[in-house]
């Protein structure tokens, strides 16, 4: 059964057991925003049932990124009447490209979704995306009725399409922040992730940061995650420059568990070989001043 926590008046975290997922719910006077919908119809229905215990408002959905546990419940919400699904441009592209492949990842907990059979198993892709090219920081605002919500992209991190959702002093961060376990680096851009975390930590209006999995944290946790990742990057550079390579011994030099460290080293080597860390410019202080959730977006 889903666990519901009201962080602020009308701002809820809805936690479900599978993947320790945190979904969000923000209430306005005219509609409500749902942040992340789970990995399939079973989890999606559990989240929806918890929401309907709180409100019967029409629903809008935001997906924080294109990993299966954050969007494969979209069809449940489409059938419940949601017509707007927000995400980053690259998130929409990734869902379209790898969504069918990702079904295999949920086949145990969500057998219907894994097989693509039954009610609410179709892939529902974003209908609305953040403005701009998708490479630089961007934002958009949604009015829920006397309740503005900001969707913003600070740069690559856990993926190339991580969107945060800010309301009042609360921000839903998806897997840009990971609490209770090491970060997942399968699709990550480690150096850019550090930059995005540090940019997030400068947004002084936010005091409660809701990770995609785990318990809400403070800005100190965000900074600590950035510091730990920066240490891992430096040690990965040392390994990469040596003749040792991403060996078993090298894994234990990183501040992560061995399996995660191996993925990190492999990902770092791939990015280094492709020079991917320079694929997009870093988030600068000027961009934060002109394109942050605290100020109107520039033209």
What are the residue ranges of the model-derived segments?
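Short, conserved active-site entrance elements at the starts or edges of catalytic domains
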Residues: 1, 123-152
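Conserved beta-strand hairpin/beta-sheet module of binuclear metal-dependent hydrolase folds
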Residues: 2-53, 163-174
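Short acidic-hydrophobic surface loop/beta-edge motif
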Residues: 5-6, 26, 137-145, 211
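Divalent metal-coordination and catalytic microenvironments
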Residues: 10, 26, 36, 51, ...
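Short catalytic-loop micro-motif centered on adjacent basic/acidic residues
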Residues: 13, 33-36, 60-63, 150-151
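Metallo-beta-lactamase
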Residues: 32-33, 39-41, 141, 148-227, ...
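Active-site HxH/HxHxD metal-binding segment of metal-dependent hydrolases
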Residues: 45, 49-135, 231
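Accessory terminal helices/loops
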Residues: 201-205, 215-299
């Amino acid at each position: 059964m889903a666990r519901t926590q009201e962080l602020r008046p009308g701002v809820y975290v809805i936690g479900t057991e599978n993947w320790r997922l945190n979904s969000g719910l923000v209430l306005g006077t005219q509609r409500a925003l749902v942040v992340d919908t789970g990995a399939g119809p079973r989890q999606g229905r559990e989240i929806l049932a918890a929401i309907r215990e709180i409100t019967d408002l029409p629903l809008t959905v935001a997906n924080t990124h294109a990993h299966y546990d954050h969007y494969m419940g979209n069809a449940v919400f489409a059938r419940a009447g949601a017509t707007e699904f927000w995400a980053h441009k690259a998130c929409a592209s990734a869902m379209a490209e790898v969504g069918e492949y990702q079904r295999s990842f949920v086949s145990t907990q969500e057998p219907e979704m894994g097989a693509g059979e039954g009610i609410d198993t179709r892939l529902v892709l974003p209908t609305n995306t953040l403005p701009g090219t998708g490479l630089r920081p961007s934002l958009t605002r949604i009015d829920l009725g006397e309740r503005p919500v900001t969707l913003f992209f600070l740069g690559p991190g856990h993926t190339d399409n991580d969107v945060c959702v800010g309301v009042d002093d609360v921000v839903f961060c998806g897997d840009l922040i990971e609490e209770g376990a090491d970060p997942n680096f399968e699709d990550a851009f480690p150096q850019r992730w550090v930059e995005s975390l540090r940019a997030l930590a400068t947004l002084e209006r936010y005091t409660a940061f809701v990770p995609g999995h785990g318990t809400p944290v403070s800005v100190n946790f965000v900074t600590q995650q950035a510091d730990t990742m920066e240490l891992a990057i430096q040690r990965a550079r040392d390994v990469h420059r040596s003749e040792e390579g991403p060996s078993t011994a090298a894994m234990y030099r990183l501040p992560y568990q061995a399996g995660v460290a191996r993925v990190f080293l492999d990902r770092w080597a791939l990015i280094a070989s492709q020079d991917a860390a320079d694929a997009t410019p870093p988030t600068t202080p000027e961009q934060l001043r002109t394109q942050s959730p605290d100020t109107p977006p520039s033209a």
